[in-house]
């Protein structure tokens, strides 16, 4: 049972039109190279579209990362960046989003090599707040290619958690039957997180358990339990019942998964 989300992060560079687009593109390539050398390339995707103060570019980048199967996004300011289109990208992307920006490489080239991405991050964060768009911004979001690669790697478990919660169903058993949520305010915080919860009666679980008596899968599960317990197997006589219970729960998960990916 696959119950852990696989994250694929699309990395989109953005550029303001009063700065060279090549500055953002080259810095994006350096970032991709740095991440690949440190962590491999399986979890990232380099979007070829550089957004240059254009809502059309934003739509093109959005479609590109969607078609590439990305479920998380990094908006990378290679220079000051276009506040409108970069924040629109974050608004319309259906998944966790991170913002980071490129530090200046050198003080020797302040004509074509200066990006002012630090200032761009300040403006981007303000515009995101104006739009009520929530994204992840590292504590120090401006850095070299290596430093931004580390930031993206730190974003991975955050993205995985958000993706998982949005597609998670919690199944529980208690005194209430299914579809009887009256007087159950404690589940509201789960709804606020985007988590679905299905409460079932313990009597339903007991009935399902009894229906699994003599299930042909029980001996194999018992054998696996014996291997796991080793010398700690002090009560082997209860293992068949535990195996029956495990199979009951696994079948329940598959039968009650509904439209959720993770249970």
Go through each PLM region and give its residues:
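Metallocofactor- and cofactor-centric catalytic cores in central/energy metabolism, strongly enriched
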Residues: 1-163, 167-171, 176-260
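Conserved metal-phosphate-binding beta-hairpin within the catalytic cores
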Residues: 263
């Amino acid at each position: 049972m696959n119950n852990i989300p696989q994250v694929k992060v699309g990395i989109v560079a953005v550029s303001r039109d009063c700065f060279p687009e090549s500055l953002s593109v080259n810095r994006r390539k350096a970032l991709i190279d740095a991440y690949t050398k440190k962590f491999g390339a399986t979890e990232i995707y380099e979007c070829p579209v550089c957004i240059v103060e254009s809502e059309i570019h934003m739509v093109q980048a959005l479609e590109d990362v969607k078609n590439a199967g990305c479920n998380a996004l990094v908006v990378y300011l290679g220079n000051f960046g276009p506040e409108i289109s970069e924040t629109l990208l974050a608004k319309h992307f259906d998944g966790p989003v991170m913002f980071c920006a490129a530090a200046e490489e050198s003080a020797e080239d302040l004509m074509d090599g200066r990006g002012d991405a630090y200032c761009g991050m300040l403006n981007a964060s303000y515009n995101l707040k104006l739009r009520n768009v929530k994204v992840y911004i590292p504590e120090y979001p401006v850095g070299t290619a290596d430093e931004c690669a580390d930031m993206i790697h730190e974003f991975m478990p955050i993205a995985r958690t958000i993706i998982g919660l949005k597609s998670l169903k919690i199944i529980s058993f208690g005194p209430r039957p299914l579809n009887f949520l009256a007087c159950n305010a404690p589940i509201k915080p789960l709804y606020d997180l985007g988590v679905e919860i299905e409460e079932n009666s313990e009597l339903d679980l007991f009935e399902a358990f009894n229906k699994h008596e003599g299930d042909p899968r029980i001996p194999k599960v018992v054998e696996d339990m014996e291997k796991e317990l080793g010398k700690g197997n002090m009560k082997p006589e209860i293992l068949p019942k535990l195996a029956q219970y495990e199979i009951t729960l696994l079948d329940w998960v598959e039968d009650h998964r509904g439209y959720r990916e993770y249970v």
